[in-house]
Amino acid sequence: MKPSDWLILQKKVRFGDCDSAGVIHFHNLLKWSHEAWEESIEIYGIPYQDIFPDFSIRKSQIIFPIVNCEANYLAPIKIGDLLKVKIYPHKINPHLFRVNSFFMKNGNKVAEGKIIHCSLDVDSRNKIELPDQLERWIEASNISTNLKEC
């Protein structure tokens, strides 16, 4: 598997994603950014439940709350647009990581999102190191930092 398999994804803009002006509702960009990195780790091979556990089934020792997020809109995104979403994860320090998402339409960047997560112990809420499998995903993703496939 090559990095583009888990770092370049697609998103089709649906009617329900848009507001009355016919462009995406502002909150959807951050939602799509989060969904993209969720999909990316699954494609990479990390079981979804290891990062986002169902606490009714089993209790995870780690949670990843969002501590910062941003969205920038560079051009209108409309119903029916097919977007490529390029993911760039980056380790900030032992307990923080950032995922940048670049949304491309017809080869042009139309939006970007940034989400920063903190790794915490579920009981104490103290900061803890990122789990090894997440570290491996970040490291493997950064091997090819200049994906030109959009």
UniProtKB/Swiss-Prot annotation:
GO BP term, example: phylloquinone biosynthetic process
Catalytic activity: 1,4-dihydroxy-2-naphthoyl-CoA + H2O = 1,4-dihydroxy-2-naphthoate + CoA + H(+)
InterPro entries: 4-hydroxybenzoyl-CoA_TE, DHNA_CoA_hydrolase, HotDog_dom_sf
Example of a GO MF term: 1,4-dihydroxy-2-naphthoyl-CoA thioesterase activity
EC number: 3.1.2.28
Keyword Hydrolase set for record: yes
Keywords in alphabetical order: Hydrolase
UniProt keyword annotation of Hydrolase present: yes
Active site positions, chain numbering: D19
Pathway terms, separated by semicolons: Cofactor biosynthesis; phylloquinone biosynthesis; Quinol/quinone metabolism; 1,4-dihydroxy-2-naphthoate biosynthesis; 1,4-dihydroxy-2-naphthoate from chorismate: step 7/7
Protein origin, superkingdom: Bacteria
PANTHER family (alphabetical): 4-HYDROXYBENZOYL-COA THIOESTERASE FAMILY MEMBER, NOVEL THIOESTERASE SUPERFAMILY DOMAIN AND SAPOSIN A-TYPE DOMAIN CONTAINING PROTEIN (0610012H03RIK)
Function: Catalyzes the hydrolysis of 1,4-dihydroxy-2-naphthoyl-CoA (DHNA-CoA) to 1,4-dihydroxy-2-naphthoate (DHNA), a reaction involved in phylloquinone (vitamin K1) biosynthesis.
Protein family per UniProt: Belongs to the 4-hydroxybenzoyl-CoA thioesterase family. DHNA-CoA hydrolase subfamily.
Name of the protein in question: 1,4-dihydroxy-2-naphthoyl-CoA hydrolase
Annotated source species: Prochlorococcus marinus (strain MIT 9312)
Higher taxonomy: Bacteria, Bacillati, Cyanobacteriota, Cyanophyceae, Synechococcales
